[in-house]
Structure formats: C-alpha cells, structure tokens
Amino acid sequence: MTTTVDLVPGLITTRDAIAAAYGCGTFQGIEPADEAGKVFVYSDPFAGEEYGYTFDGRAEDDEFGPLYLYTGAGPNGDQKPSGRNGSLLSHAEKNREVHLFVAHGKVPGSGAMQQRYIGQMVLDPVKPYDIRRGPGRDGVMRNVLVFRFRPAEGTTPAWTEADQTPAAAKTTIEVTDPAVAVPAPVVLPQQSGAKVKKTEQHNTSETIADIPAGQRKVLRREGELVRAFAAHLAAAGHKTHSFQITIAGEPGVLTPDLYDATDHVLYEAKGLTTRANVRMAIGQLADYRRHIPGRKELRVAVLLPSKPTVDVKDLLGEEYVELVYQTDHGFVGWPLAYT
C-alpha cells in the first residue's frame, strides 16, 4: 500500500486509489481487501439498466430506516450466495467492514470512472438479500441477489437525489419461484476505521433503526409458513409459483408470497395472526391482484399461522378474501370453497 485514503462520506475518488490504499482489486463490483479487513462495494445503477433491470439504488425508507439495494456478482446464470457474494454475507463473522461507493461520472480527461463514497454499511439483519429476476449479460433471465444495506451505526451517508432507485420504464410481470427461503440473519458488526459524523438516534432520515429480534422471528415464521403450505399444495398435485411485478414510473418491485396456478389463487402470508397484519395482507392483495393475468377470475386468500378472531374472519369475508390457517394437523380452510 503506497497511499492513504480517508474514508469520509462524500469523498470523490477512484477504484485505483482505493486499491492502492487498501490492497483490493479494481474490476469487480465487490472487492474484498482481506488484510485491511474491509469489503468495498461499487454500485452503478446505470450499468444495470444496460441489461434491463434497475435494482441498485436507495429504496424508500421503511420502518427500520434508510435502505440501499445492491445487485450481487455474477454476469450470467443464477447468482449464488458464495464467492464475492459470500464475502458480503460473511463480513460480520469475519469482522470486515463494508464500504459503499456509487459511480460518479468520469475523471476529467480520462475514461476512468469516479467513485463517490456513500459510507460504511451493514447488511440488513432481518433480511440480508432478496432474490429477484433479471436478465444476465447473455440476455437470459436468471435469479439475482439484491443485497439490502443499512447505514452502520454512527454513519451519516452521503446520499443524493441521484441515488434513488430508478423508476421502471414499463409495467411487467415475471413468473418466479415462491419466496419461501428466508436468508440467515446477519449479526451487526461494531463500526471502526471510518471517519463519520455521529448522528442522533431520533434523526430518522439518516440513522439505522434498532431492529428488534422479534421482527426477525416473525419474518422467519412467515417464510416457514409459506414453505409448509407450498409443500402441502405440491403434495396435492398443485403447481405453485409467484410473480415479480414492476410498475411503470415507480422504483422497486411487487412480490406476492405464493400463487396456486392450479386453482388460480393468490396467497399473502403473515407471520403473526393480528388484526394489523390481516389488514395489511388485505391491502397487499388488493394491490397485487390488479396486475395478475386473469384478475376477474382470480381469488385471493390470507395465509396465517393460527386461527384469527371471529371479527377478523368477518372482515376477510366482507372483503371477499379467503382464509387459510395452519394447525397441528394441516391447513384449515383449504381446499377453498368454490363460490
């Protein structure tokens, strides 16, 4: 290492400068620097647009705070949680920091790309990545890993409006496998080595939320519920999948939990049987169904881990939403009654 680079959010630098300072490579989007104990991530949303997908960028803040999405490594074929992608997933257990850069135009008088340093990140501890469908460099659709970054504690990210996830150019619907596997949670590492400005915990626009372990358990319970019900349907000879829906003019994608192609039923699962969760599921199904082929004949159902109250059952009935819930002996409410 022949130079030093102070990692201050907002810094404009180059891959070569980072490589010279920390001993990493310069050509890949994910560049581990083993001796320095860091993993450098270079995001370029416009590179994704070249191949027909726009996953990279700052997503809408959720109840846990800011969120940045980043498409994993692998130009063709299904991306795997190994290799360079694995270096992100294992960064906490190996005590490596993750540092995010975004492409920032060309170096004046040169073809080299400038990089703007956003700040130190951690993988979302509830859901480290989503699996999305997108074309490879060869034009063939495949599964891609979309990592979910949160600002590390104490980091004030150097976001700009240009970092927002690009809006989809058109409305599309892509058949996908059901999202039944929940990635293993990632332990949040302690921050060190990056120069950052400490933010107040109540500055919701710029600070990472304290994500409770309970939320992680609910998400895992939801994934296990979908997996069990998909297996139940398969044993009955039913074909299942899900959808990835993009909406023209909007960033991100819609991803219903499970579609029973045999009975033309769309299911939305919840990990807790509460009124709030059921109301959320009703709204999600109302949104999803507008984009599903054969929407007039489509039936929708809520999948729950236990029996809801009588009034919640009545709510579902008034909204013409079917109910299926799990018991020790299987699933009550399935097969659905034909009406």
Regions found by a protein language model. Give the residues of each.
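Charged, structured surface patches that assemble and position nucleic-acid processing machinery
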Residues: 322-332, 336-339
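Compact mixed alphabeta submodule
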Residues: 110-181
